[in-house]
């Protein structure tokens, strides 16, 4: 294979002319498209960085809100627990007061029944004494009979 110098020079000249023609008519357009694409890529990267920063800020803000909500929930829980404890204490106190009231009423009722029973016993004692007196007046009572009547009276009274 032989290399013809004139063909090589001619090819180099053609290549240079094609480059000059392409540069003259298309290089600015291609360069503009490339710069436009580079700007778009840079804007997209910038936007992605901004979005990532916003996302980090939202994440921090959401974590703060979550922490605040947890603290608020804890405060509410503690307040409700304290309220429940207070209500429990009030219920227990009211129950104690009611129990004491019932106990007091029962004691008063027992005291009334005791007084009523004592009154009935006294009434029966008086009735028995009257009956004994009537029997004593009906009979001539000697000391032995008198003792027997008193013993019967005591037995009836339950002393």
UniProtKB/Swiss-Prot annotation:
SUBUNIT field: F-type ATPases have 2 components, F(1) - the catalytic core - and F(0) - the membrane proton channel. F(1) has five subunits: alpha(3), beta(3), gamma(1), delta(1), epsilon(1). F(0) has three main subunits: a(1), b(2) and c(10-14). The alpha and beta chains form an alternating ring which encloses part of the gamma chain. F(1) is attached to F(0) by a central stalk formed by the gamma and epsilon chains, while a peripheral stalk is formed by the delta and b chains.
Please name the gene that encodes this protein.
atpF
**Signal peptide (from-to):** none
Where in the cell? Cell membrane
Note whether rRNA processing occurs among the keywords.
Answer: no
The similarity annotation says:
Belongs to the ATPase B chain family.
Protein name (record): ATP synthase subunit b
- Per the UniProt record, which residue ranges are transmembrane? 7-27
Role summary:
F(1)F(0) ATP synthase produces ATP from ADP in the presence of a proton or sodium gradient. F-type ATPases consist of two structural domains, F(1) containing the extramembraneous catalytic core and F(0) containing the membrane proton channel, linked together by a central stalk and a peripheral stalk. During catalysis, ATP synthesis in the catalytic domain of F(1) is coupled via a rotary mechanism of the central stalk subunits to proton translocation.
GO annotations of cellular component type: plasma membrane; proton-transporting ATP synthase complex
Keyword annotations for this protein? ATP synthesis, Cell membrane, CF(0), Hydrogen ion transport, Ion transport, Membrane, Transmembrane, Transmembrane helix, Transport
GO MF terms here are: proton-transporting ATP synthase activity, rotational mechanism; proton-transporting ATPase activity, rotational mechanism
Query: How does the protein's chain sit in the membrane according to the entry?
Result: Single-pass membrane protein
Q: Entry's SUPFAM superfamilies?
A: F1F0 ATP synthase subunit B, membrane domain
